[in-house]
């Protein structure tokens, strides 16, 4: 936690899996803003819906009382291996609705990879959308990050968006 504070950060994405309660306690004490997320990553597996639902329920039940949590993350880079399809979108709607049923006070989000694209319907299911962009890292042109975000904001001026990963492997 000390290193995070030294960086001047006030927001932490606890990505891809459940984290120790001790760290959530540290985040509460330090006044951090936390994004908690289930490990629904890279590929949608049609037979995995019950697993994602179970993990989301457990994440919320175990961490609901932590003041640090501002949003529940429903997936990460889900379109890397899975082309956009109805079952994947349906599962995102199920998870998003579940989060709001279990916790009416917090937002939902997901982390999209660039190939998801700003017009992909999955990017518009949750309350917030964030992008894992490595423009300027894997491909030249750091300025492309600004262009990406400006374009998204131009198309969707009332949509909350952010960076979820960037640079040296996030």
Task: Indicate residue ranges for each PLM-predicted region.
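Substrate-binding/catalytic cleft of secreted carbohydrate-active enzymes
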Residues: 2-4, 11-170
């Amino acid at each position: 936690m000390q290193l995070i504070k030294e960086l001047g950060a006030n927001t932490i994405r606890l990505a891809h899996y459940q984290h120790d309660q001790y760290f959530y306690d540290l985040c509460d004490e330090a006044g951090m803003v936390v994004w908690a997320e289930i490990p629904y990553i890279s590929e949608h597996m049609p037979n995995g819906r019950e697993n994602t639902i179970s993990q989301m329920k457990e994440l919320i039940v175990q961490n609901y009382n932590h003041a640090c949590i501002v949003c529940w993350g429903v997936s990460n880079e889900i379109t890397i291996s899975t082309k956009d399809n109805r079952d994947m979108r349906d599962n995102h709607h199920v998870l998003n609705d579940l989060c709001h049923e279990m916790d009416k006070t917090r937002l939902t989000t997901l982390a999209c990879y660039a190939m998801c694209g700003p017009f992909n319907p999955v990017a518009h299911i949750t309350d917030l959308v964030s992008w894992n962009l490595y423009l300027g890292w894997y491909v030249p042109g750091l300025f492309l990050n600004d262009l990406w975000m400006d374009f998204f904001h131009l198309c969707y001026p009332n949509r909350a968006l952010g960076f979820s990963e960037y640079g040296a492997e996030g």
